[in-house]
Structure formats: C-alpha cells, structure tokens
Design a protein with these regions (language model features):
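Periplasmic-binding protein-like
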Residues: 188-197, 236-260, 305-307
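A ligand-binding cleft/hinge motif common to bilobed small-molecule-binding domains
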Residues: 82-85, 216, 222-239
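Ligand-binding "clamshell"
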Residues: 87-94, 116-120, 232-244, 306-308
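Early extracytoplasmic/lumenal segment of secretory-pathway proteins
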Residues: 23-85
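Extracytoplasmic ligand-binding site segments that recognize negatively charged/polar headgroups
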Residues: 36, 72, 77-219
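Mature extracytoplasmic/periplasmic domains
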Residues: 250, 254, 259-317
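Bacterial N-terminal signal peptides
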Residues: 7-16
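Sec/Tat signal peptide C-region and signal peptidase I cleavage site
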Residues: 18-22
Length: 318
C-alpha cells in the first residue's frame, strides 16, 4: 500500500510540474515568403523558444483573424494602415522598449510614423513602394503611367493585386486623387474604373504572391507589384523592369506588433528584438529583397550597386 501511495504521489507531483517544464514558444503570424527560414532556426537555437509560424496572404485576412481572437498570436506583421486601425480598436499591446535594444537601429523617419505617432505599438520590419513590374518584350513602349493597366492592347495580360488597399489606391492615383482620400465621390470613381478594367477583360488574374513567379515565367505583360517582389523577380528575368508611375504611388511600411493579451509577451519581445539585429535584418533583406528600415543592416551592405538600386531603396524623388 505504501508503495502504491508513493507511486501515486510521484505521478501527481510530476503532473503538477509538467506545465513549468513545457517548452517556451512564440506564435508568429506573418506574410507568405516574408522571412529567411534560417533566421527562425537561429532564433530557436539561441533562445530555446519554439516558433509556431503561421502565414497570411492579405492584410484583411490577418485583420479578421486578429479581431476574432488576438490572444492566438504573439507577433504579427501588419501594414501601416492596419496598424493604425488595430491601435484605434485597442487590439495591440504597448511595447517595452527596455527589452528592445536593437530597435535603436530603426531609421529616424520611421521611429514615430503617422500611423503610430509615438512609436508605442510597432517596430518597422520592411518598407517599399507599389508599382508596375512589366516585361520589356511584351509591351509596346516603356511603362510610365498607371493608365497602361487600363490599355486595351493588354487584354488578358495584366495581373492586379488581390488587395483592396493597393488596387483601389492605383485607380485613385491614376485619376489624380490621394491614395488616402475618404471622399466618396473619388472612391466611387475609382471603383468604377476598376469595374471598367475588369469588364474589358484586361485583368488576367487578381492575386498576390503568385504574380512574381508568373512574371518570371513571362505569363503576362505587366503586374501590379510591391517593390520587393519586383526586385526578386527581376533577379531571375532580365526582361523585367519596375517603375513607380509618374502619377505617384504609395510608400508603405510593414511593422511588427504584439496583439492585446498575447500569451507569450516576453518571448514576442525577444523575437522582435532578434529581427532588429543588424546582421539578422540583413539576412532577411537579402532573402526577400524588401527595403530594410534597419540602419545597422544598411551599413553592412558593401555593394554600392545594391544601395543605388531604387527598386530596393527608393529615393526621396520616387
């Protein structure tokens, strides 16, 4: 009987101890193809924290998931306008910068951006532009204007984004409006232009991540694309070129945030700070080709041609 009691007590004690022995983790919700896989491995090896990595394809998909239950995620990667919305809905935790020493490398102009004026809720991850990636062998002349995406000579030859913000923004810019306008007449006019484009059969497909591979394969004359994906595609196909049209475009920023009530807040801070290390930020830049907001990483780039590439590092004029 004593032996049975001892076994029972031992089992009970082990059961009580199991939660404390459980492996630490961090739940990350990021875009498709938006991190160097080796970076995750390095973080896990250094910290012993397991990264549960989940992916989304649009800001809107991510927003719905976070609104439904923010506690499911510890680190998310929303774009600027979604960060602003998440702040307004009280769905983000304030960041403890005492645990983010590598945030010091953030470029000055991104430390207190309009969408997060005090920089309390987000650390920039990547930034870039929206433009047109086109195949020089499949267009009649170099592309300079957004109107090219409505040109009927390119029927069934244009990829548009499956992104309300960017697709509507392009139509607004083509019509001479701000991408951020809230004027309903302007928004309805832009909506009508997009309907007109679709009815004319110009759009081959509405998609996001697939466009870069299909442009590499020469499957369309042009596609609406973010600058990083364009740079990646051009590295595989010399016939491709990227342009920010003369009417102007959107400079966007994707940030790293911690949702309200995150279960692993401390681990989330460790993950964000790890990504802000200059050498780690450089690894991500080299892998995904988006513009890094990390001054330390930029200093590590020793190729002047890379620094001069306006697809990778847009100038003030762009």
């Amino acid at each position: 009987m004593k032996k049975l009691l001892a076994v029972f007590l031992t089992a009970s004690l082990l059961a009580c101890a199991l939660p404390a022995l459980a492996a630490e983790e961090v739940n990350v919700f990021n875009w498709e193809d938006y991190i160097c896989d080796e970076v995750i491995d390095l973080f896990e090896e250094e910290t012993g924290i397991k990264v549960n990595y989940m992916r989304f394809t649009t800001n809107e998909d991510m927003l719905v998931q976070v609104q439904a239950d923010p506690k499911n995620y510890d680190v998310i990667f929303p774009s600027d306008y979604i960060i602003e919305r998440l702040i307004s809905e009280d769905l983000l935790e304030e960041l403890d910068y005492s645990q983010l020493p590598n945030a010091q490398y953030t470029l000055d102009w991104l430390k207190t951006p309009d969408y997060d004026p005090e920089g309390k809720y987000s650390v920039p991850y990547m930034w870039g532009t929206v433009g047109i990636l086109y195949n020089k062998t499949l267009v009649s002349a170099p592309i300079t204007s957004w109107t090219a995406m409505w040109d009927e000579q390119y029927v069934d030859n244009v990829f548009m984004m499956d992104s309300i913000r960017d697709t509507l923004g392009v139509a607004l810019k083509m019509l001479g409006y701000s991408m951020n306008t809230r004027d309903m007449d302007a928004l309805n006019e832009a909506k009508d232009k997009l309907i007109e484009q679709k009815k004319a059969g110009i759009v081959k497909a509405y998609q996001v991540d697939e466009t870069k591979d299909k442009m590499i394969a020469g499957e369309a004359a042009m596609g609406l694309m973010w600058s990083g994906d364009a740079a990646y595609a051009m590295s595989f196909n010399d016939d491709l070129a990227y342009v920010v049209p003369e009417e102007g475009s959107n400079v966007w920023v994707d940030g790293m945030c911690i949702p309200k009530g995150a279960k692993n807040y401390e681990n989330a801070l460790k993950f964000i700070d790890f990504l802000c290390r200059p050498e780690i930020a450089l690894m991500n830049f080299e892998e995904i080709c988006y513009c890094t907001p990390n001054s330390g990483a930029i200093e590590l780039i020793d190729d002047p041609e890379v620094l001069a590439d306006e697809t990778l590092f847009p100038s003030d004029e762009t």
